[in-house]
Design a protein with these regions (language model features):
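Bacterial N-terminal signal peptides that target proteins for export
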Residues: 2-14
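Bacterial N-terminal signal peptides
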Residues: 12-23
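Long, intrinsically disordered, low-complexity segments
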Residues: 27-28, 59, 111-114, 197-199, ...
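An aromatic- and glycine-enriched ligand-binding surface/loop that stacks and positions planar moieties
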Residues: 28-91, 169-171, 195, 199, ...
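Conserved, well-structured interaction surfaces
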Residues: 49-52, 56, 60-64, 86-168, ...
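C-terminal substrate/ligand-recognition segments
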Residues: 105, 359-455
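Acidic, serine/threonine/proline-rich low-complexity intrinsically disordered regions
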Residues: 171, 175-178, 185-188, 236, ...
């Protein structure tokens, strides 16, 4: 018989103790937070919703980036964007202020918070029978859902460890409940060990977790469990983690076995998507608009897994609407402004450009039909406060139809796309190229059709582009691939970490450009590239510093990352 649980489990790992009450919620589309006290398994199995609530609490720690740095996103610490408000916290990444004492991220605490809840659930709350409900008509469906929670918890724990390892390298591997004192003294596992844990967990649960919540027959719950991790999310996590493990940051000796594994696992995602009849969306912009990607099949048909924000709001729109708008569009903050580095990467005719970036002369549909004036002296340009310093405004993830000011102000849904099919075409192409060394030839032992260029071209076709140029040298093909990934995944949280895992930040992240737009007397415009920011780079920044507070709490068990 289980006894009352010692509630002093670690949640921030070393930062704070779990309180006597948890915020629990049901697993419906909107997080419905309720407060419960947890004492033991007997209490937990009094109601199914208590177990479901604990899982929802774990899901609530999933990452997103709708302006995590006072409106700025990580894109504004890359060559994707410049944040239009001087002095924003995002500048610490490149102005010399970044340090263990100013660690620039709460992810360490957030991830270990989620991991602690996963360990709590797995150690204490599996194997319950909910005997009081045996005669209920929904008992079998409720039990099916409950029994699936353990696989979801293991997926979420593995996902949190992926977030940690890509940011810090090796971290403490805590896989069971322990006291805060014990947890604070755990040494770092190596990055290889963390990647191995992620891989083994995904292997163990991939055939256990639900494959499709929409195809459960009599076991289906109402409302449908949209947004929960399924078999495909597990495959996607495993494949992405393998790609990172094979990359130069974590694979200094270029071990081809790691690239082989990355290729196999990313191909498995493509094959699984094909078996489910998933295709690249015909609505690229809709992939990132919450009122669309929440449920619209044209968009959701490409999305593998996403983080649904619990409440509707207009915060991201307020951060990123152009300044100088009137009426429904008034009140925008300029925000994360795309760079000329990004804009110049788009080829002529690339449909992704107009769905990602607003340029001088474009219209902003909800506000008015007057073209945007991002030129110097224009309504939406400098020297107006917070106007774009680059000449461009952001469209991607921005719901342009939202009214952010006045009596008609409204809100919208937001879904952060964690995994989508398009990424895995690119991942597979990258792994194949690193095996073959040639962009147009399949690696030894692969089918002749397994050419890196083929999978890149699938992405280009959706954008309305011709196949990529043939006959490129290995170096030029690599550059073309990196450019394709740059534009396809812009503002999705990849660039910050892609350039780091390639160890190419000194190439991409130092000279940040915009355009200087001038209106001539005859109403024409001149556009001249200009340097907007010259950013500092030091190779120690390939990994984050571990927060100094955590180092001190460890009593010497935790070692700091090199250079910090």
């Amino acid at each position: 018989m289980r006894t009352k649980i010692n509630i002093k489990v670690v949640v921030g790992v070393f930062s704070f103790l779990l309180p006597l009450s948890f915020l629990f919620s049901s697993c419906s589309e909107q997080m419905d937070y309720k407060e419960y006290s947890i004492y033991d398994a007997a209490y937990m199995q009094k109601k199914f919703e208590r177990a479901g609530g604990l899982l929802s609490t774990i899901y609530a720690d999933l990452d997103s980036d709708f302006g995590n740095y006072d409106g700025a996103t990580l894109s504004s610490a890359t060559d994707e964007a410049v944040y239009s408000h001087d002095g924003n916290a995002i500048e610490s990444f490149f102005n010399g202020a970044w340090s263990p004492a100013n660690a620039n991220s709460s992810l360490w605490t957030t991830c270990y918070h989620g991991i602690a809840y996963c360990n709590l659930f797995l150690d204490e709350f599996t194997g319950l029978t909910f005997d009081d409900y045996v005669l209920d008509k929904n008992y079998m469906a409720e039990m099916y859902q409950y029994n699936n929670y353990q696989w979801e918890a293991r997926f979420l724990r593995a996902y949190y460890y992926f977030l940690l390892v890509r940011q810090y390298g090796g971290v403490p591997l805590i896989t069971s409940n322990m006291s805060a004192d014990d947890a604070s003294r755990q040494p770092r596992a190596t990055a290889d060990e963390v990647f191995a844990f992620i891989d083994s967990e995904c292997e163990a649960i991939k055939d256990q977790i639900t494959k499709d919540y929409g195809d459960l027959g009599d076991l289906a719950m109402s409302p449908a469990n949209n947004g929960r991790a399924n078999n495909l999310a597990v495959l996607a996590l495993r494949a992405r983690a393998a790609l990172y493990h094979a990359s130069p940051l974590f694979n200094a000796n270029n071990d081809k076995n790691l690239w082989q594994k990355a290729a196999e696992l990313n191909k498995a995602v493509l094959d699984s998507c094909s078996a489910r009849k998933m295709k690249l969306s015909t609505d690229y912009k809709g992939l990132f608009i919450g009122n669309t990607n929440w449920s619209d099949s044209k968009a959701t048909g490409e999305i593998i897994f996403g983080r649904r924000m619990p409440t509707e709001n207009r915060n991201f729109e307020t951060y990123n609407f152009p300044v100088g708008m009137t009426g429904a569009g008034a009140g925008g903050g300029g925000g994360n402004c795309p760079t000329y580095n990004l804009v110049s990467a788009y080829e002529d005719g690339d449909s992704r450009k107009e769905q990602t970036i607003a340029c001088n002369g474009d219209s902003w549909p909800n506000a008015n039909t007057v073209p945007l004036e991002t030129y110097y002296g224009g309504v939406n340009g400098l020297p107006n406060a917070y106007a774009t310093p680059t000449g461009y405004y952001l469209k991607k993830y921005v719901t342009e139809s939202v009214q952010i000011a006045g009596n008609g102000a409204n809100t919208c849904k937001h879904v952060w796309v964690t995994f989508r099919l398009g990424e895995f075409y690119l991942n597979y192409a990258e792994a194949l190229f690193n095996l073959s060394g040639d962009g147009y030839t399949a690696p030894t032992g692969y089918a002749a059709s397994a050419k890196p260029s083929y999978y890149i071209n699938q992405i280009r076709k959706r954008a309305g582009l011709k196949d990529m140029e043939t006959g490129l040298s290995a170096a030029d093909f690599k550059a073309a691939y990196e450019k394709e990934r740059f534009v396809e995944l812009a503002f999705e949280g990849h660039r910050f970490f892609d350039v780091r895992r390639w160890k190419e930040a000194d190439k991409y992240f130092t000279n940040i450009q915009g355009i200087d737009i001038k209106k001539t007397a005859d109403g024409q415009f001149t556009e001249t590239p200009k340097t907007v920011q010259t950013r500092q780079w030091n190779d120690k920044m390939y990994l984050f510093p571990i927060p100094q507070s955590e180092i001190l709490k460890s009593g010497g068990a935790l070692t700091q990352n090199p250079g910090w």
